[in-house]
Amino acid sequence: IPFVEPQAWHRIAAASDDLECYLSFYCKPEDYMAKKYDTRAHSEVLEAVQSGHIKPGRTLDLGCGHGRNALYLASLGHDVTAVDVNNEATQRIQMIADEENYNVRAGYYDINAAALPESETFDFILSTVVFMFLDPDQIPSIIKNMQERTVVGGYNLIVCAMDTEEHPCTMPFPFTFEEGELKNY
């Protein structure tokens, strides 16, 4: 089956009267949500998946925002729980997930509470571009809670602003990680 390069014009011209065609558009999973819903998965999430470390399983997106990571992972077969303090955003995620027939449960959760239900465990917990907006005093409890809710052999992925001598953070975030800080957890 021939592929036409992305963003290229194409035209099918009949060489005879009996030409029959079937045209379908192919899209990589990482591009589908971006093209259809304007929500692209974070590059670190893409890298974790494409490296083979993250396999479909029970996934928690902490601070899911508009669902860029939750929807991408659900499209790959993950069973996703997506939580955020923005109810409008989680309602939109749930609507999209239902339209796409993805296994997603989206709802309200305040990450600062560090109180994920003891009855739930996950293979993969991620939080991208969220920690720098959280209460700095709660970070140790939040990370401990994430670790307690992650199955043995599971993964946690945190993407957060850092403040190092070489690359000082110029934004006035309430929290940034210091170099090597996560080694303490």
Predicted regions and their residues:
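Class I (Rossmann-like) S-adenosyl-L-methionine-dependent methyltransferase catalytic domain
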Residues: 8, 22, 26-56, 60, ...
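Fe(II)/2-oxoglutarate
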Residues: 3, 18-20
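Conserved metal-binding segment of the jelly-roll/cupin
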Residues: 2-9
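A short acidic, Gly/Pro-enriched loop at the edge of an enzyme's catalytic core
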Residues: 116-125
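A short SAM/SAH-binding and catalytic strip from SAM-dependent methyltransferases
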Residues: 124-138
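Short beta-strand His + acidic residue motifs that chelate non-heme Fe in jelly-roll/DSBH
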Residues: 10-15
